């Protein structure tokens, strides 16, 4: 349907309320990392098993034995995998083994820069060229033509403007562009702007017309 425009992002999960709402267990951080490592191994293993072959996984949390007869993906050997997070040891290690792209929230340019470097070092430790992993960052977008409009949009997504200033690209188009530039200077090759209020079409239009042209 998408002509191959598919990416898969996997993480350990962090919002306990979301898990509880759907009846999904929320184990300890170490166990969530163990499960994520197995999940990444299973997904990539299934995708790369030749047609008619057998994929076997005997892990601590998952066990399966299936034929590799899944529909082949358009992207080969498989769709890009995104791994992200701020963990300083296991997250970079998993990204080095499995990821096509590493992603982090750009709350702090200094921390993002340091985390990107940890991922590069983890790649070198397993004999992988760090250039094979793209570095990306994400920021909540809250853009307005003036201060009053920015404050209104902040209220509409339930976040005080003071809180947004650290976790978001918030402000006028010029201020949002400057915040994005900080992320790029920290090492982000790709930037994702998270839009919280999808019904605010004027917000999307403003970003599309007055921000995105200056980020290409």
Predicted regions and their residues:
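Active-site-adjacent structural elements that line small-molecule/cofactor binding pockets in enzymes
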Residues: 1-216
């Amino acid at each position: 349907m998408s002509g191959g425009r598919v990416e898969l992002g996997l993480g350990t999960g962090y919002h306990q309320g979301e898990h509880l709402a759907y009846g999904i267990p929320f184990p300890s951080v170490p166990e969530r990392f163990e499960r994520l490592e197995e999940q990444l191994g299973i997904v990539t293993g299934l995708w790369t098993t030749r047609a008619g072959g057998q994929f076997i996984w005997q892990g601590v949390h998952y066990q399966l034995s299936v034929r590799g007869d899944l529909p082949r993906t358009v992207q080969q050997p498989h769709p890009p995998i995104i791994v992200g997070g701020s963990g300083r040891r296991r997250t970079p290690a998993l990204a080095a083994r499995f990821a096509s792209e590493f992603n982090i929230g750009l709350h702090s340019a200094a921390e993002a820069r340091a985390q990107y470097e940890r991922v590069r070092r983890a790649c070198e430790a397993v004999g992988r060229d760090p250039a094979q992993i793209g570095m990306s960052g994400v920021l909540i977008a809250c853009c307005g033509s003036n201060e009053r409009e920015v404050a209104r949009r902040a209220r509409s997504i339930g976040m005080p403007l003071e809180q947004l200033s650290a976790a978001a690209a918030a402000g006028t188009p010029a201020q949002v562009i400057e915040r994005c530039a900080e992320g790029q200077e920290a090492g982000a090759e790709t930037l994702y702007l998270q839009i919280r209020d999808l019904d605010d079409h004027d917000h999307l239009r403003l970003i599309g017309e007055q921000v995105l042209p200056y980020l290409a």
